[in-house]
Amino acid sequence: MKKEFIMLLLLLQTIMNLNSINTNTSTSIVKELQKNLYIFNSKEYQKDKDTLNEFINSININDKEILQSLEKIKNELFIISVFFNNKKGILIALNLGAEINFKYKISPISISIINNEFEITKILIDYGISLNQIDDTGYSPIFWAIYTNNEKIFEFLKESGADLSFTLKNRKTPMQAAIETENIKLIKSLEKKKIYIDDNFKKKLKKLKNKEIVRILVK
């Protein structure tokens, strides 16, 4: 990531020998990690993930003072826990009352799909996250499942009630996205549901180079 974590590491070294974290430290760690979200392939990613793991594991859930401190930053804790694939952190934040549909540029469920984290995606859906929310990326979760070719999460979203006819501002539908990626399994899955295809797009289908897609959709 762009910023160094020297100060953060010094804070961690200071509390290594303590039995539990203090309120100021918990806030500092969460705030520092939040500053550097969404650089998925950063060289610092694993180090930051390990930092969060150490932090989460040091939380004493029986310490009311610590929980009160975390409650003030529950949404921030929630989003960084999703980003760094920390299930324990996610559950702590949600049980503290974090907003399930809280988004910091990218929605939590979009992050879990991009990270290919099925279990976290399932947790978020079980807790009632919106399946059709469009975040700052301009896409809803079903589109992220399609564009990452994540068939398992796509099917789970479909079974969980995601809108398969959801239309973006540019009038693109999930079917059109699946055709773009040439994912035959997803195209067949959508076709079985008789998903809407824009009339203008239908005219272009016969000209597709992928004849298998043409055979499936042009009847």
From Swiss-Prot:
| Superkingdom assignment | Bacteria
Task: State the signal peptide span.
Answer: none
Q: Which Gene3D superfamilies match?
A: Ankyrin repeat-containing domain
UniProtKB keywords: ANK repeat, Repeat
Q: Does the keyword Electron transport apply?
A: no
Keyword Manganese among record annotations: no
**Whereabouts are the ANK repeats?**
104-133, 137-166, 170-199
Official protein name in the record: Putative ankyrin repeat protein BB_0399
State the organism named in the record. Answer: Borreliella burgdorferi (strain ATCC 35210 / DSM 4680 / CIP 102532 / B31) (Borrelia burgdorferi)
